[in-house]
Amino acid sequence: MNALACLAEAFAWLIRPGIRRFILLPLAVNITLFAAGSYAAFHYSDALVESLLPGWLAWLHWLLYPLLAVALLILTYYSFSLMANLIAAPFNSLLAAAVEKAERGDPSPPATPLWRDILMSLIQELHKLLYFLALALPTLILALILPPFAPVLWFLYTAWCAALQYLDYPMANNAVPFHAQRARLRQNRADTLACGGAISLLTTIPVLNLVAMPVGVIAATLYWCRHLRQP
């Protein structure tokens, strides 16, 4: 798939001249928050999983416990990823702009005040967060009603949200409204879910999760430039 090819290529961009300087601060944010996420996941997951298992399914405890544990682990890491993206949003937008400039060879866009970039990035992140929370509610209800399908439901949720999270940076830089972003990604649903799912899985792999954020931004920008951006 096109998006997965861009994701694989994104790792090489981490050391590309002109790109590295935009990665250092988001990388520091990622390391700090994923350390906190790992601590929370491994110290509180058992009690939470036990509380989510209904008594009438006790006979399936051996099967449902590992499934819910995996779903909770993915959700925990993705929650901390959202926090990291909120904090690093202005710098991720700069990284996306630098990658797009290098990929397309365009001249630099007109400079805007840093405070304005930070403010607009934070507003956009809050907008996305509200959308993600609104989408999480029906997903949670379905997961509670159908516990055996909870891991699949949460994986689809995190894949869609991760794709929106990272593709927003290059698309917002090109003044594509959030509702138009969602419409465009629905037209490329398979590629979108594959990319988002791969990035979500990347956040759960030790060591690789430390570079998941910049890799996700770079991959999303390459995918935007090569396959989504209209001439």
Map each language-model feature to its residues.
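Helix-coil boundary and N-terminal low-complexity module in membrane systems
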Residues: 1-136, 140, 178, 187-192, ...
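Selective recognition of hydrophobic, aromatic-rich stretches within alpha-helical transmembrane segments
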Residues: 65-100, 143-173, 207-231
